[in-house]
Amino acid sequence: MTTSLYKSQITMFIVMVIIGMLFNPMNILAYRFTDLYISHTLFYGGVLMASNMIWGHEIVHYLSMGHFNMLSFSIGIALSISTSILLLREQLLVDDNQWLRRMIPHHSTALTTSHKIYNRTTNPNIKALSREIINTQEKEILLMKSML
């Protein structure tokens, strides 16, 4: 592999990680823009999304060129999946501050979905539950922000 091709692929992967972080579905559901934080867990999710995009691209590219190698693909996909699982499930390098930075957007997502169902539902049980979730999540977000 030439140096310029290698640099190009690294650059493409970095761009995909950034896109994966910015367009994380959970971030899109945040109730307020001020509830969004960059965290290690968000980065790890971006790495997972980027590796998925890369492998999808590689499969299509090599199948269309007739150069698909099942062994290389299997090793690569196993490494990508195991690395992503290790980073996300084990929460490597995630300390108290990093945990709070990911939990605030998570709770903000609950606000978005709960506000929407509260305004749409006619079921009194769902309305009461969504109101309780809204109140609880608002309090927890304020507490977490004060701890940062």
Report residues per predicted region.
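His/Met- and acidic-residue-enriched segments that coordinate or traffic transition-metal cofactors
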Residues: 1-148
